[in-house]
């Protein structure tokens, strides 16, 4: 009986690992491709309404975090992304949250609720209508895109753990 339970547990864990690996195959296929120039979208504004230009972060590794307050998977992923920020920002990695919210108050509330300290920008438009989602090929959130210091896409993914592994490699060199 114990052997059977162990077998089921191992099978379940293996299935979860496979499911996790397959999430990029399922949800990240339309994201910008590695090696391409990161699109420079001119319509993003900070939570205070100031214009944001991605090129202002040139020279640094940047993690773009596409999310929304109304997105259950984003809320589930938020603590992990906050931990990545807390770990890698002191090492020079910049994080930019790109919200797909249309309601600024809901956006502000989620930022406070999850203790998000990194820069937040948005177009305050419906997800599929935003220039930034179109430019980056974002059809699913949360999505993350890691950009190198030269403005090239290193990693498009829906898995924060992949971002963590890449940042660990980049900062340990």
What are these regions (language model features)?
Residues 1-19, 173:
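Bacterial Sec-dependent N-terminal signal peptides
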Residues 13-41, 55, 109-112:
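N-proximal helix/coil linker or "cap" segments that precede and/or mark the start of modular domains
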Residues 42-62:
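A short beta-strand-turn-helix
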Residues 58, 66-83:
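Conserved redox-active cysteine motifs that mediate thiol-disulfide chemistry
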Residues 58-60, 90, 116, 138:
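Active-site acidic short loop of glycosyltransferases
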Residues 76-114, 125-134:
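Structural microenvironment flanking redox-active thiols in thiol-disulfide oxidoreductases
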Residues 116, 124-170:
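Thiol/disulfide oxidoreductase modules built on the thioredoxin-like
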């Amino acid at each position: 009986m114990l052997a059977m339970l162990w077998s089921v547990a191992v099978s379940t864990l293996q299935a979860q690992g496979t499911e996790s690996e397959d999430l990029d195959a399922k949800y990240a296929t339309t994201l910008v491709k590695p090696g391409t120039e990161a699109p420079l979208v001119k319509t993003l504004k900070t939570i205070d309404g100031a214009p944001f230009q991605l090129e202002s972060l040139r020279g640094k590794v940047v993690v773009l975090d596409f999310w929304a307050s109304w997105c259950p998977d984003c809320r589930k992923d938020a603590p992990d992304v906050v931990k990545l920020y807390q770990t890698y920002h002191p090492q020079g990695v910049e994080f930019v949250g790109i919200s797909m919210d249309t309601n600024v108050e809901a956006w502000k509330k989620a930022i406070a609720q999850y203790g998000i300290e990194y820069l937040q920008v948005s177009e305050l438009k419906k997800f599929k209508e935003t220039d930034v989602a179109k430019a980056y090929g974002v059809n699913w959130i949360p999505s993350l895109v890691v950009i190198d210091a030269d403005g090239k896409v290193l990693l498009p993914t829906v898995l924060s753990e992949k971002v963590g592994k890449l940042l660990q490699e980049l900062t340990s060199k």
